[in-house]
Amino acid sequence: MLRLEKLVKTYKTGDQALKEVDLEIPQGQVLALIGPSGAGKSTLIRCVNRLVEPSSGKVYLGNVELTGLSSSALRRERRRMGMIFQEYALVERLTVMENVLSGRLGYVGFWRSFMRRFPQADVDEAFRLLDRVGLAHMADKRADELSGGQRQRVGICRALIQDPALLLVDEPTASLDPKTSRQIMRLICELCRERGLAAIINIHDVALAQMFVQRVIGLRFGAMVYDGPPEGLTPDRLTEIYGEEDWEATIEQVDDDEIEAAE
């Protein structure tokens, strides 16, 4: 599904954000990226869809080498990669429905998108997705009227309406409270299972990674230092990943009754 070969990103300052990362993710696998600040987690995600250009190495989505594509070919392939952002990246003045449908901009012509005249099949799918995440009744609300958790659900719908093969998820819970964070992580993982999607989730909360994903990648100074199941994240292993940074501080505290409510 997704394959990274010797992926390197070196900035003009000489700082190396990624150091020859080799990674393969099969279809349907949800993977979490963990590591201290500056480890290269967000850079890795953005190198996959070339929002950040890799310095060297190759990225394959299926049989397509993304790193060798022209701009127009890359735009087509980006339709296969849904992106979910930390700060939601919604258009505040647009409605929930309009924000979701913006995920179809890569499929409809300029004038149809400019006039917001999307095919009925796209509108129907948007309603189905909003219903799945519990927001169908808010389709006509403006985005700036929503809570953080509701905004992230809209962002999830916008990514899924692209009908992607891969989800790239960058710190989806960083702006949310512990209870809502668990709800959002559970929702993302459930939707990936339902749709057979592969996903890379950059997550700051180690406990969320341990709770919800099948596989964890630990990055430190741009290099992979752990690749395995969440059960393998022992205190010693986490100290190896985070170094002097207190990894326990990344774990959001939540009361037992809040965990139960998030189920």
From Swiss-Prot:
The lineage of its organism: Bacteria, Pseudomonadati, Pseudomonadota, Alphaproteobacteria, Rhodobacterales. It is an enzyme of class 7 (translocase). InterPro entries: AAA+_ATPase, ABC_transporter-like_ATP-bd, ABC_transporter-like_CS, ABC_transpr_PhnC, MetN_ABC_transporter-like, P-loop_NTPase. Belongs to the ABC transporter superfamily. Phosphonates importer (TC 3.A.1.9.1) family. Its EC number is 7.3.2.2. One of its GO terms (molecular function) is ATP hydrolysis activity. Gene3D superfamilies: P-loop containing nucleotide triphosphate hydrolases. It is a peripheral membrane protein. Residues 2-246 form the ABC transporter domain. It catalyses: phosphonate(out) + ATP + H2O = phosphonate(in) + ADP + phosphate + H(+). GO terms for cellular component: plasma membrane. Its main location: membrane. NCBIfam families: ABC_phnC. ATP binds at G35, P36, S37, G38, A39, G40, K41, S42. It comes from Roseobacter denitrificans (strain ATCC 33942 / OCh 114) (Erythrobacter sp. (strain OCh 114)). This is Phosphonates import ATP-binding protein PhnC 1. Part of the ABC transporter complex PhnCDE involved in phosphonates import. Responsible for energy coupling to the transport system. It is found in: Cell inner membrane. The complex is composed of two ATP-binding proteins (PhnC), two transmembrane proteins (PhnE) and a solute-binding protein (PhnD). Keywords: ATP-binding, Cell inner membrane, Cell membrane, Membrane, Nucleotide-binding, Phosphonate transport, Translocase, Transport.
